[in-house]
Amino acid sequence: MTPKRALISLTSYHGPFYKDGAKTGVFVVEILRSFDTFEKHGFEVDFVSETGGFGWDEHYLPKSFIGGEDKMNFETKNSAFNKALARIKTANEVNASDYKIFFASAGHGALFDYPKAKNLQDIASKIYANGGVIAAICHGPLLFDGLIDIKTTRPLIEGKAITGFPLEGEIALGVDDILRSRKLTTVERVANKNGAKYLAPIHPWDDYSITDGKLVTGVNANSSYSTTIRAINALYS
């Protein structure tokens, strides 16, 4: 029997972002929880980034953000999570036909590379065209900017409903002015630009995720589990 396989994408960007000079990159909790959930539901999981590189968002590594089983999986060198992470592939090394689910994780690093990550977009569009699922969380839906539905040659999210990290959350984090000064976009703008309907959570930290056919999106790290479960359910719907 062919194993069920999911592909989790990471942002390749790891550079200064915050006002204190700290670097942004991958939000570790998002991928810890999604990886664990996929594994517990019988999926083999691989990681990919546009360049094959990645780095952690330095604001979200403290113990206050990582605890319990997440902390154990992150700190244990031979955990399934770290073994998979050590095998991370560049996007052009991936065969899209090997996977049923493409899961775009985030972190503010995604603001920099996802909208122009053509190879990741190509993988996602092929998985979707083959009847698979595209899921994205937090800033992950920025990957949809320029992502084309192979069958229609239109934006893949056109006419669909998506969610993702809201501007209200950027304001609460004190980074909205950074986005403006560096001309970085938001999930809501990407939705509007590509003909999708953006659905905002009541509060930016709510566990909120939605499904529209084979397209699944979630708002933040608190939505990692529900978004992953929705992606699995969408595959079999």
UniProtKB/Swiss-Prot annotation:
EC code: 4.2.1.130
InterPro entries in the record: Class_I_gatase-like, Prot/Nucl_acid_deglycase
UniProt superkingdom: Eukaryota
GO biological process: cellular response to nutrient levels; chaperone-mediated protein folding; methylglyoxal catabolic process; methylglyoxal catabolic process to D-lactate via S-lactoyl-glutathione
Tagged with keyword Heme: no
Keyword Methyltransferase: no
SUPFAM superfamilies: Class I glutamine amidotransferase-like (SSF52317)
GO molecular function, one term: protein folding chaperone
Residues of the active site: 138, 139, 170
Disruption phenotype: Results in higher sensitivity to oxidative stress, reduced thermotolerance, accumulation of higher levels of reactive oxygen species, and reduced chronological life span.
Induction section of the entry: Induced during entry into stationary phase.
UniProt subcellular location: Cytoplasm, P-body
An annotated GO cellular component: cytoplasm
Class in the EC hierarchy, top level: lyase
Entry's family note: Belongs to the peptidase C56 family. HSP31-like subfamily.
Subunit description: Homodimer.
Protein name: Probable glutathione-independent glyoxalase HSP32
Species of the source: Saccharomyces cerevisiae (strain ATCC 204508 / S288c)
The gene coding this protein: HSP32
